[in-house]
Amino acid sequence: MAKWLENAIFYEIYPQSFNDTNGDGIGDFQGIIEKLDYIKETGFNAIWMNPCFDSPFGDAGYDVRDYKKTAARYGTNEDIKRLFDECHKRDMHILLDLVPGHTSVEHEWFKKSMLPEINEYTDRYIWTSNIWEQPEGLNCIRGISDRDGSAGVNFFSSQ
């Protein structure tokens, strides 16, 4: 464990509702940057930011479409780099909420897992052996691909 974590006091931010600087009704990275001094002055030395990756937002950003790109509604990849830089200037740390347990059905990995041919993505998601099978306790979406089987979902059909 990193040494700084022993004394970390986290301020959790859901970017969508935090601070809107461009008037579109949605919080953004610039809005977080604007409030860093306030956050620091109130005694926090770390930020835990809820999902900010590219997403169709079927589940508040937890249905990630691309882990390498930030959600455009919050800003650009350059904007988030600036947010990290501004945190570091204030001796603050920032952690991003990463949800590796599921992705959006629009994620490239899921799309590749939908192919009928076996590939490196075939087993990255839970699929039944045929479209009619539904194991007890597993919600499934059927008929979404050429693959024979139904995809198991964690929460919503969008993930």
Predicted regions located by residue number:
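The substrate-binding groove and active-site-proximal loops of carbohydrate-active enzymes
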Residues: 16-29, 61-77, 159
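Glycan-processing catalytic domains of CAZymes
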Residues: 28-36, 40, 78, 84, ...
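Aromatic-lined carbohydrate-binding/catalytic grooves of carbohydrate-active enzymes
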Residues: 38-82, 92, 103-104
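Hydrophobic faces of well-ordered beta-strands that scaffold small-molecule active sites
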Residues: 9-12, 47-49, 94-96
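Active-site beta-loop-alpha junctions enriched in small/polar residues
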Residues: 16, 52, 99-101
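Conserved structural scaffold segments of CAZyme catalytic domains across common CAZy folds
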Residues: 1-33, 37, 41
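Hydrophobic or amphipathic alpha-helical targeting/insertion segments
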Residues: 83-111, 115
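Alpha-amylase-like alpha-glycosidases and glucanotransferases acting on alpha-linked glucans and related
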Residues: 2-10, 14, 60, 104-159
